[in-house]
Every structure is written in structure tokens, then in C-alpha cells.
Amino acid sequence: AIKAFYPARVPFPLLHIDTGHNFPEALVYRDWLVNHYNLRMHVGSVQKAIDEGKIKEEKGFNASRNNLQTYVLLDELEKGKYDAALGGGRRDEEKARAKERFFSHRDEFGQWDPKNQRPELWNLFNGRKHFGEHFRVFPISNWTELDVWRYLAAEEFPLPNLYFAHKRNVFERDGVLLPDCEYITRRPDEIVKEELIRCRTIGDMTCTGVWRSSAATIEEIIQEVATSRLTERGGRSDDKRSETSMEDRKKQGYF
């Protein structure tokens, strides 16, 4: 969008659904991006919705605010009367996203019906909607993780250091390395160790699994991704709650 509208300002705002459980580095990068490119940003707060009694926080060892984002997201989209929301989802990430259209229609409740999707022939997209409905538009649906990194290398676009190898205190839970943080309650047998890791996908600290890696440059990451046999969301604990976890959330209005 920045390149498409340059030298003019991007005419639409960014929307961040803030769970309050973010990596601090992600928020620093978000604020830098907004200021550097003179962008507008709206922030929907999950914590505010909890405080107002609109949603209830999960409890227990695997508690996460991931699902709670849906209510806040739909509320913000309704307030803004948006016709469409642009996202970076890709089909190679997860099986539910693999069958989603470029123009993903959402009904008046913000819900997605995977059995009622519109045909998309070549580059022809149907943008018709009724009042109260909207679209989630995913321009890079057919890109792979490797495509993304090759593009970033070509554009030399600045990125948060979370994507590059760094030392962090982590512990293992159900085969996933999780960052040690104040938002996660550890079990007695979960031991914290400092490891050299990086993030392949970034969400809440409570559900973002990290990967052991020494890739400290984009070129090294490209080599690593090219030989990887696991998808980037393979470390996301929120996708492991059930076989259809992502699809169930998307039906409710998730990203």
C-alpha cells in the first residue's frame, strides 16, 4: 500500500487489535512503522473489552486471549463501517486458509461460511455486498513463506528483530517452545532455558511458538525456510486446540 500510493499518504488506516499480551518488540516496531510512514492507526483493546465485561478472560495453564480478539475485531469493523479489511493471510499457512478466497465474504455478523464462497476466475473478483456485510481481502494468498522473504530481501524493508535469531528465555510445552513471560502460567515441570531462537510468525506471547534458529540475516532465513518441512504456523499453540481450530475461529469472525 505504501508503494502503491507513494508519494501520497496511504488513504486508509491500519487496524491493530491489541490483546495486551504482545511482544514488546512488536509494539515498538508498530509505533515506528506508523510514525515513519505517516500512517493512521486505530487500536481496538481486548483489555478494555474485558474491563467493561463484554468478554470473559480464560483461566488456566493454556489461557489465551487469541479467541477474544474476534469480538473486538468485529466491533471495530462495525464502528468504522469498513467495506473491506486487507490482511496478510496466505494459503500455505494453514488448511482453513488454504480454501479461503482472495475476496473473503463476511456476512452481517462478520462470519465466514466456507461452503458459501464465491467463484474467483483468474483475476476476476466479486466485490458486491449487502449493507452490513464486508470483505476480508488477502492479496498475497498464493504467496509462500519463501516468496515473502525473497520479496523482503529485494525491497530491503526493515523488520522487527523478532524474526531474526536472538537469545530468549523459553520453555517447552506439548512440543512447542514458548517464550517465558508474565502472561503464561508455567506448570511445575516446565523448565526455563535460554536458547537461540527466532519467530516465524508473531502473535500473542501466550500462543506464539518460537523456533531454534541461528539465522540472523534475511539471506540465512531464506536458506532456512527453503529447507524447512514445517509451516510457520506449526509452532502456534492456538492452532493446536483442535483439528479445526482455525476454521472454527474464522467462522466466528476471526482474521
Regions found by a protein language model. Give the residues of each.
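Nucleotide-activated chemistry modules centered on ATP-dependent adenylation/adenylyltransferase
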Residues: 1-255
